[in-house]
Amino acid sequence: MARHTPIERYRNIGISAHIDAGKTTTTERILFYTGINHKIGEVHDGAATMDWMEQEQERGITITSAATTCFWKGMENNFAEHRINIIDTPGHVDFTIEVERSMRVLDGACMVYCAVGGVQPQSETVWRQANKYKVPRLAFVNKMDRTGANFFKVVDQMKLRLKASPVPMVIPIGAEENFTGVVDLLKMKAIIWDEASQGMLFDYREIPAELLELAKEWREKMVEAAAEASEELMNKYLEEGDLTEDEIKFGIRTRTIASEIQPMYCGSAFKNKGVQRMLDAVVEFMPSPVDIPPVKGMDEDENPVVRQANDTEKFSALAFKLMTDPFVGQLTFVRVYSGVLQKGDSVYNPIRGKKERIGRIVQMHANNRQEVSEIVAGDIAACVGLKDVTTGETLCDPGAIIMLERMVFPEPVITQAVEPKTKVDQEKMGIALQRLAQEDPSFRVKTDEESGQTLIAGMGELHLEIIVDRMKREFGVEANVGKPQVAYRETIRKTVEDAEGKFVRQSGGKGQYGHVVLKIEPNEPGKGIQFIDAIKGGVVPREFIPAVEKGINEAVTSGVLAGYPVVDVKVTLHFGSYHDVDSNENAFKMAAIFGFKEGCRKAGPVILEPMMAVEVETPEDYAGNVMGDLSSRRGMVQGMEDMVGGGKAIKAEVPLSEMFGYSTTLRSMSQGRATYTMEFKHYTEAPRNVSEAIMAARAK
């Protein structure tokens, strides 16, 4: 089956925004315009009509949230048909993991900002992640019809807060209730959308006289930005003082794909204005899969391999999201980087060393779910039938193994005990939590061995609240939750050369004998537990080495100070002894546990606590109080910036344990006018008095 759309006409983009910037409306409008211009029935057999209202009544719109495909031929039907895959990204900081994994598979992103609220802390987090994956971006300033809307203020904020280089390609005509359209700086014409056709129709008009000078000034800046793309363009611009429309488009596209600039648009999705122009920009300025560097990975011998984005290469894809669907079971969303995948094919997962068969392949077209028989390079689709895949794992051709760079998921920083409201729900709760943990790698579930309680762990209070809410909504399980607890860790500061562990039971009959000598030393932060086998001359037989490692892995789950997990320790097994008859795996496992605990006690054990990056936005009058309060919570204030719209943005690092209930304090301190965001930064050694209090609390 030949591909319908050449890969050069693919655009894989994300729409990303702060919570209230109007991302959902923007996405809906995109599907609305593309849906009307492209009846799916034309391309595939069986006419598929789109009934928009029906979709809104059902909960269909959430199903489309992971990835939706639509088609666009341009606002004036002047392009060849392009296929746009839209990947949804959440706006809340507790779900940075979601943003991170969608950024990993995007080729470009459209950042939506509110014309009133501007650039907010969440927007910064998303921007940083887009920088990390070098994702080209364009910006859309939404809600131009709202009171207080100011397009140029948002341009300034992007420069100041995001260190971005926005290049407005349009400027608004009017603002607030007088917002009627935009001036297109490329064509130097006003675009006025027709209200009656919900913005499907529009007119080009002359630029209103009062805006002409402003439009010329911004056009000059746009042409200048385009000219910097190459020496050739720059010379022409310096000689002639202008560039042609095609040259400007070429310059802007080149620099956008290189992440040097961000084309900027504005409108009101709710009032059907401006979204169509932004869609044109996606086609004109966002990269196709072949415009960006090919994907890199490792083969089974850990040699670097590169896969070009075309159908003749061997198949490779990344699973970036799992969802449970009430009708088809588990959906695994994948981004295909190279090759072709047909339904019924087997794929190999190099992380787990397993082959699996693809049952069905499904693509979302706005509100239509469509089964397809194959997917090709550049596609995004959901596979049904994969049992053992989690987010961030590679799927590839079993005959040509490649392991794409894995996503690194942060360790949870907060835990809560959870129990079902009725005993009947116990089993249902277990299944629900397991499912949710599969979908979200930053959420963990475990059982506390002493109390038998089920513990859930995540990235923040809101993260866990939403998990509990989803259990109720999607699985019908009501649960009570305990008070949030901080996820402390333990580590060591000194090296112990000879930590000895012996496990001997010899009282007639078959006994037990295991003896190990370990070197225990601090490892680099973030490196985790490393086990090195340095046994010479068989003093500990080969077959018992895995048992020693198993013992170490068991021992690190509970540290010597307060029973918290131990991190960042290097353990080297370098000596030991055995008994011909009495030695067995269990004896060596126990010896390793004793040796490790003994070594840790001598190695200067310390407790680590999670530090959070906190940012508070507050009116100036309360800034002093806010800073004083953060300091009283053992916080280190790292700086204060002026916000473009007045007020101060205060950045600090504060231990998580001091931040519970902070929102209530902040509300009363600022009469409800200050807001804050918080995300995990790193673990650091807890001060002595804090460590002692933690140990005392655990000893009770």
Curated annotation (Swiss-Prot):
The protein's matches in InterPro entries, at most eight in alphabetical order, are given as:
EFG_II (IPR041095), EFG_III (IPR009022), EFG_III/V (IPR035647), EFG_IV (IPR047872), EFG_V (IPR035649), EFG_V-like (IPR000640), EFTu-like_2 (IPR004161), G_TR_CS (IPR031157)
Keyword field: Cytoplasm, Elongation factor, GTP-binding, Nucleotide-binding, Protein biosynthesis
Localization per record: Cytoplasm
Output the Gene Ontology cellular-component terms: cytoplasm
- What NCBIfam families would the database entry show? EF-G (TIGR00484), PRK12740.1-5 (NF009381), small_GTP (TIGR00231)
- Functional description taken from the UniProt entry: Catalyzes the GTP-dependent ribosomal translocation step during translation elongation. During this step, the ribosome changes from the pre-translocational (PRE) to the post-translocational (POST) state as the newly formed A-site-bound peptidyl-tRNA and P-site-bound deacylated tRNA move to the P and E sites, respectively. Catalyzes the coordinated movement of the two tRNA molecules, the mRNA and conformational changes in the ribosome.
Q: What is this protein called?
A: Elongation factor G
Record organism: Albidiferax ferrireducens (strain ATCC BAA-621 / DSM 15236 / T118)
Organism lineage reads as: Bacteria, Pseudomonadati, Pseudomonadota, Betaproteobacteria, Burkholderiales
